[in-house]
A protein has these predicted regions:
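Hydrophobic transmembrane-helix bundles of small-molecule transporters
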Residues: 171-266
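A membrane-interface helix-boundary motif in multi-pass transporters
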Residues: 167-179, 221-225, 408-427
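Extracellular/periplasmic helix-loop-helix junction of adjacent transmembrane segments
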Residues: 39-68, 106
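Helix-loop-helix hairpins in multi-pass membrane proteins, especially solute transporters
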Residues: 69-199, 364, 393
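Transmembrane alpha-helical cores of Major Facilitator Superfamily
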Residues: 27, 56-63, 90, 114, ...
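12-transmembrane solute porter fold
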Residues: 15-32, 36-37, 51, 82, ...
Length: 444
């Protein structure tokens, strides 16, 4: 894929007609995924399962999205985006129907979420690839900006959808909403261009090893069986051996010889495990401590997401006055403060948690671009596609593991202790950043 090629005006005009359709699918997919993250409380109650068990419907979904992004990006070089979108909607439909029919069996609900998410994963990745392949280079930033706004919008709508559907209908009704994506099929077939196929390949082995690494970590956090540590060690060893020997791996061993790249990945992994850890904790905490229903909890999340939108939109201007190191350090300090606040005022008014989530979400929005830029700038620009792909995969694995360890803590320690633990993990990320990256010279 060559995103820098010239696109004729007539072709670009036709290509732009497909953008609204892709954005609708993009927003719709994220709404569904975010809705299911919020209703873990309702699923656990309805099916009589533990917090740790129910967390798997969110953690495995995150893992599938991360791996799915790499798979769809690889397939887009050999299969038309049009065909991949149709396949994505097929997965969404199959998973949603299966989940609704077998809503009383958690193993089948889990399988349904995996199938459904395999389809949802197509939306974001294929939109970015479509913009790079079919729209003029000088307009690509504008269209990519639409995806950022769409993501923020989906967080708001997703939390409201999950909260109100689970409160006034039933959480299982969320499996019916994705079926509306079928209505997009005629528009996709009408406006999406037919592309020529060319040979490409997906690194199945590499992705399976990444999945094995992430899953073994999550299983160990859940059950603490030593066998999972052995599986983890074996998976890591096999992955490193594979990428050092294979000529077709999706990432080369040379990337891991770059200390700055590895350091940024380590920091990103630690800090982003905290992100969905707190978001997963939020509804459980407010439901058990304050007796709030999910519809009310979803409303309390909105100020945080709106703050993220505003900060994200302003981060470009702010970055002109701060270096990446300064921006990331400030963001991590604010994240730690947002988690320490409810610890100090535990049991106080609910507004404390609203303010906490506003600081938390805004800080992550502020940190995203400079931390990503630190990662991308560690290697030549010609390798930026691979860097971004593996960075995003790392974030998805980290958030999945964050949900897992938070769910495990919910069942064994107090909410106050969990908040303290999350703040300490954030401070650990800040220390690692200062030791490994903070003292090095930033690439020009």
């Amino acid at each position: 894929m060559n995103p820098t090629h010239h696109v004729p005006d007539a072709q670009a005009s036709l290509a732009k007609k497909a953008v609204p359709v892709l954005l609708i699918f993009f927003v719709f997919s994220l709404i569904i995924d975010n809705s299911f993250k919020l209703v873990s409380v309702a699923i656990a109650k309805d099916l009589g399962i533990s917090t740790t068990t129910v967390s798997w419907q969110a953690t495995l979904a995150g893992l599938v999205i991360g791996i799915g992004a790499v798979v769809y990006a690889s397939l887009a070089d050999s299969i038309s985006i049009r065909s991949l979108l149709v396949a994505g909607i097929g997965f969404i439909t199959a998973g949603s129907v299966l989940g609704f029919v077998f809503q009383h069996s958690f193993p089948l609900v889990l399988l349904s979420r995996i199938i459904q998410t395999a389809g949802l994963a197509s939306a974001e990745t294929l939109y970015v690839i479509y913009v790079a392949k079919h729209l003029p280079k000088n307009e690509q930033k504008r269209f990519l900006g639409y995806s950022t706004s769409s993501y923020s919008l989906s967080l708001v709508i997703g939390s409201l959808t999950g909260g109100f559907v689970s409160t006034y209908l039933n959480w299982a009704a969320l499996f019916l909403i994705p079926l509306l994506s079928i209505a997009l099929l005629p528009l996709i077939l009408k406006y999406m261009p037919k592309e020529e196929s060319k040979k490409s390949r997906v690194d199945i082995v590499g992705l399976l090893l990444i999945a094995a690494i992430a899953t073994s970590v999550m299983l160990y956090i859940t059950d603490f069986y030593w066998i999972y540590i052995l599986v983890l060690a074996a998976s890591v060893a096999l992955f490193l051996l594979y990428i050092s020997k294979s000529k077709h791996s999706f990432i080369d061993i040379a990337f891991f010889k770059n200390k700055r790249f590895v350091s940024v990945l380590a920091v990103a992994f630690i800090i982003y495990s905290v992100q969905l850890g707190y978001i997963f904790l939020f509804p459980f905490l407010l439901e058990k401590v304050y007796g709030l229903h999910l519809d009310t909890i979803s409303l309390l999340l909105i100020p945080g997401y709106v703050t993220a939108v505003v900060v994200g939109a302003s981060s470009g201007t702010i970055s002109k006055y701060l270096s990446n190191k300064q921006s990331v350090s400030i963001a991590m300090i604010m994240i730690a403060a947002s988690l320490i606040l409810p610890v100090l005022l535990y049991g106080g008014p609910v507004i404390v948690y609203v303010i906490s989530m506003m600081l938390f979400s805004g800080s992550f929005a502020f940190m995203y671009a400079p931390l990503l830029d630190s990662c991308v700038s560690a290697l030549p620009s010609s390798q930026s596609g691979t860097v971004i792909g593996f960075y995003n995969l790392t974030l998805n694995v980290a958030t999945s593991i964050g949900i897992t360890y938070t769910a495990a803590m919910i069942e064994s320690v107090s909410f106050k202790t969990i908040l303290s633990a999350l703040s300490l993990i954030t401070l650990l990320a800040l220390c690692v950043y200062g030791l490994l990256i903070g003292k090095t010279k930033e690439p020009a």
